[in-house]
């Protein structure tokens, strides 16, 4: 592109050189206002160079290139002609600058405003949270079944009190004194274990999914942390791109001046003596927008990571309390089995019922603990989903469709 523009400029100058006088006005390609036009930005660039050793190195290299070009052009300025060596110097300088920009851009890797990885990650998080909510619902159903068993045991204890006190007048002679109690115990036994094998398979599946999600979120967080540390490098890219375009314009102006108006070469050379390049307002906006985008991604990932971690801990608590409840459930079932097996022995039934009575409050407490933890887990998941959604809604996007894709991921 640079060589094409250069060739066209030289062709135009060659066609008009025969009729040109010393008073010929400068062609449009010659820019003498670059220094004043970007004076504020050049000052900002000076500050950036002082803070960034790599930018200092780039600036020094750029000065060397432009000085070589100026010297080559100045040597033939009085004859209003360009030597072959000067042409090579100009084209070589422009090519080197282009290559430098390409190198920086290649190393920049990706555009953060259209991040497909983040969209996939959000999808995975909300899919996982939905499955975890399903698990919480499964826990609630199990707790409801356990509470039914609790009610049966409670009713059995009431029957036992009545039958033990002799207040139950409906007992026929020759029948088991604790017939009603044993009937309720049979109902409790028939209700079975509310936390069967399918429940624990679901728990393990959801838990493993949470562990995998947490690992992915951890890797993504480290990746974004690295990007935030490299923000200065991204700012450097915008500096390099802008200053390259700036110098390219000035070089073409010098080339045009060398043919059209030799005295202007000196003035342009003086302009180039100013520390060249500028980040400019648009470049400054560019890298700040990038930094904001990366921080926005990090906020989303952090909120998902916290949500996944809290969910894992909630599930750990549910697992612990379910295990405790199963222990109490098995203990109750053993006592019920003993009473039913020894139903003809009133003493054995009384002993079993006394043991059931002593453990009944603990059994009830374990059921409530599981239910409370399932409710807490469900609330935490809902809260985490809301927080992630808020971050997504405030997430900077290069297009409305990008944000729409993220929102669609959690509303389907």
Curated annotation (Swiss-Prot):
Q: Which InterPro entries match?
A: DUF677 (IPR007749)
Q: Does the keyword Transport apply?
A: no
* Segments of this protein annotated with the region Disordered: 1-30
Subcellular compartments: Membrane
Which regions span the lipid bilayer?
Answer: 240-260, 263-283
Q: Which GO terms describe its cellular component?
A: membrane
Q: What is its main location?
A: membrane
Q: How does it sit in the membrane?
A: Multi-pass membrane protein
- Provide this UniProt record's keywords sorted from A to Z: Coiled coil, Membrane, Transmembrane, Transmembrane helix
Which residue windows are coiled coil? Answer: 314-348
The family assignment reads: Belongs to the UPF0496 family.
Q: Which PANTHER family match?
A: (RAPE) HYPOTHETICAL PROTEIN (PTHR31113:SF25), UPF0496 PROTEIN 3-RELATED (PTHR31113)
Q: What is this protein called?
A: UPF0496 protein At5g66675
């Amino acid at each position: 592109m640079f060589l094409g523009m250069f060739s066209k400029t030289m062709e135009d100058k060659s066609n008009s050189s025969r009729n040109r006088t010393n008073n010929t006005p400068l062609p449009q390609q010659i820019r003498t206002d670059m220094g004043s036009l970007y004076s504020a930005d050049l000052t900002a660039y000076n500050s950036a160079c002082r803070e960034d050793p790599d930018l200092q190195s780039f600036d020094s290299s750029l000065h060397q290139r432009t000085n070589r070009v100026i010297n080559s052009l100045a040597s033939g300025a009085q004859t209003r002609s360009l030597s072959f060596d000067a042409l090579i110097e100009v084209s070589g300088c422009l090519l080197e600058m282009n290559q430098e920009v390409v190198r920086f851009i290649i190393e920049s890797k990706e555009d953060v405003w259209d991040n497909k990885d983040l969209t996939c990650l959000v999808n995975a998080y909300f899919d996982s949270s939905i499955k975890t909510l399903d698990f919480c619902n499964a826990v609630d159903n199990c707790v409801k079944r356990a509470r039914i068993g609790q009610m049966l045991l409670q009713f059995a204890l009431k029957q036992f009190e009545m039958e033990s006190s002799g207040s139950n007048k409906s007992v026929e002679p020759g029948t088991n004194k604790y017939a009603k109690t044993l009937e309720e115990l049979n109902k409790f036994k028939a209700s079975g274990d509310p936390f069967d094998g399918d429940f624990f398979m679901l728990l393990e599946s959801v838990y493993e999914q949470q562990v995998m999600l947490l690992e992915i979120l951890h890797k993504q967080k480290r990746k974004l942390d690295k990007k935030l540390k490299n923000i200065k490098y991204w700012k450097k890219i915008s500096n390099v791109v802008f200053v390259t375009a700036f110098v390219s314009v000035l070089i073409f102006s010098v080339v045009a001046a060398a043919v059209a108006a030799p005295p202007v070469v000196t003035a342009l050379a003086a302009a180039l003596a100013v520390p060249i390049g500028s980040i400019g307002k648009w470049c400054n906006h560019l890298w700040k927008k990038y930094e904001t985008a990366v921080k926005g991604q990090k906020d989303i990932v952090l909120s998902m990571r916290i949500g996944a971690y809290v969910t894992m801990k909630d599930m750990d608590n549910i697992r612990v309390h379910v295990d405790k409840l199963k222990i109490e459930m098995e203990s109750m079932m053993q006592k019920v089995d003993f009473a039913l097996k020894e139903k003809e022995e009133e003493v054995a039934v009384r002993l079993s019922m006394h043991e059931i009575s002593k453990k009944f409050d603990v059994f009830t407490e374990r059921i409530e603990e599981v239910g409370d933890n399932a409710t807490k887990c469900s609330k935490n998941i809902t809260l985490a989903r809301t927080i992630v959604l808020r971050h997504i809604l405030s997430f900077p996007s290069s297009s409305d469709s990008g944000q729409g894709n993220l929102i669609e991921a959690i509303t389907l």
